[in-house]
Amino acid sequence: MKIPLFFNNTARSARVGRFRRWLDRHRDFFDVIEPESREDMLNHLVSQANSGAPAVAVAGGDGTLGIAARALCNTETVLAPFPAGTMNVFSREIGIRPDFDHALHILNTGRSKNVDLFAFNGQVFLQMAGIGADARAVELTTWEMKKKWKALAYVIAGARVCTEKQPHLTLRSEE
């Protein structure tokens, strides 16, 4: 039985090209689904979970995996990440190296673990949500920067945030 593999065909990470070449050699394992949008991916993943799929593979970065987490939370369907993004923080944190063969090996062993998710204003988050300077640095990090500088792009954006006028808040208390 082929595993449904969701591939973010709009992702522009340098790893996406490598993943496509890797996938060409491993298509026998997967039923590849390339949704047209984030909403389309979410709907397809929910449909897979509702139909009782035991597992779905998702190739992409942290943003793509976040969409998958929203769709699959509180279901019995296992998420099998294939790290194809720039940073792949979540995959690294759960022990999946940025190596597609390693991700396939883990999928084939059936090894899984439960992870805690959190929600804010009804939005499910897989690993973190940032505010302030952290969120601004992510906002300033463009695809072009990630392509040229890879992980260093976030450091560069963070430095830019430090040069911006910072908001000021004063709290007063009776004490």
Map each language-model feature to its residues.
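ATP/NTP phosphate-donor binding region
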Residues: 1-56, 66, 70, 74, ...
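Catalytic core of DAGKc-family lipid kinases
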Residues: 4-7, 74-78, 82-174
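Glycine-rich nucleotide phosphate-binding loop and flanking beta-alpha elements
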Residues: 13, 63-65, 88, 132
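N-terminal glycine-rich "phosphate-gripper" loop used for MgATP/nucleotide binding
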Residues: 58-62
